[in-house]
A protein has these predicted regions:
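Carbohydrate-associated surface elements
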Residues: 58, 79
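Short donor-sugar binding/catalytic loops of nucleotide-sugar-dependent glycosyltransferases
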Residues: 102-106, 121, 136, 161
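Short hydrophobic beta-strand element within catalytic cores of glycosyltransferases
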Residues: 195, 200, 204-207, 217, ...
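A short, histidine- and acid-enriched strand-loop-helix "catalytic/donor-clamping" loop
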Residues: 2-5, 13, 18-36, 48-51
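Acidic donor-binding loop of glycosyltransferase active sites
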Residues: 171-187, 203
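Nucleotide-activated donor-binding/catalytic signature segment of Leloir-type glycosyltransferases, i.e.
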Residues: 141-164
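Short alpha-helical donor nucleotide-sugar binding micro-motif in glycosyltransferases
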Residues: 160-161, 168-173
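Conserved donor-binding/catalytic core segment of Leloir-type glycosyltransferases
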Residues: 53, 91-109, 115-118, 131
């Protein structure tokens, strides 16, 4: 979104030429802070820009409600490199159950919810191991929660891993977990690419009825979705 605003201004100044297509992904069309700052400029972009490319039907509808002409909107889905995330051989669930999340460690990824769920699983005597791959501003908060619930023996946070290591860990996993939620400032997902990669590999996914996720995961058929 904001990049399109900048491009439109540069074209108006004669710095660049050509048509302007603007992608709307997630935070740029959901965060109250971003919208409070950019909504007036988005209105100008809707008039002056050539094409708006929201990554979900949900965002397409929101753009229309914000005043963008329908004829300037085309949903442009994100994709996955299938040469890197090819289907793995079918595997039976392991004991303990291997659960994995790959995400930037922010509020909207809902990993605090995942850790709470792990606390309940451990109390119920379920044998599992949970890996959270990624870095981000919520790392300290999540580690503190793990310590508070005494889950250090079942939850591992190895940080950032290169894509080939992520793929190897996905191949070993039994469940991909991403309980996305709406952040306190309204920040929402678009459609998480990490979910697409897990599905491309062939891992059962568990996520939430959040933003564009139901456009990717067909509930009870290609994965399990629960309310935020």
């Amino acid at each position: 979104g904001p990049a399109g605003v900048t491009a439109a201004k540069l074209r108006e100044l004669g710095v660049i030429r050509g048509k302007i297509a603007t992608i709307f992904h997630g935070i740029d069309i959901s965060s109250r802070e971003v919208l409070n700052h950019y909504t007036p400029e988005y209105q100008q972009l809707f008039r002056r820009g050539d094409l708006m490319l929201p990554i979900s039907n949900l965002w397409a509808g929101r753009l229309q409600k914000m005043g963008c002409p329908r004829e300037k909107i085309a949903v442009s889905r994100m994709g996955v490199d299938m040469t890197r995330f090819s289907p793995r051989p079918v595997k039976a669930p392991a004991t303990p159950l291997e659960i994995i999340s790959v995400a930037r460690l922010t509020e909207k990824k809902g990993l605090h919810v995942a850790i709470e769920a792990c606390r309940q699983l451990k109390e119920q005597g379920v044998a599992f191991r949970y890996r959270i791959l990624g870095i981000g501003p919520w790392e300290r908060r999540l580690r503190t929660l793990i310590e508070q619930y005494q889950l250090e023996d079942v939850i591992e946070m190895p940080g950032f891993k290169p894509s080939h290591e992520v793929k190897a860990m996905l191949d070993d996993a039994d469940v991909f977990l991403l309980p996305s939620v709406t952040g306190a400032d309204g920040d929402m997902e678009g459609i998480p690419v990490a979910l697409m990669e897990a599905m491309a590999v062939g891992i059962p996914v568990v996520s939430t009825l959040h933003s564009g996720i139901p456009e990717l995961v067909e509930a009870d058929k290609s994965g399990w979705l629960v309310p935020e």
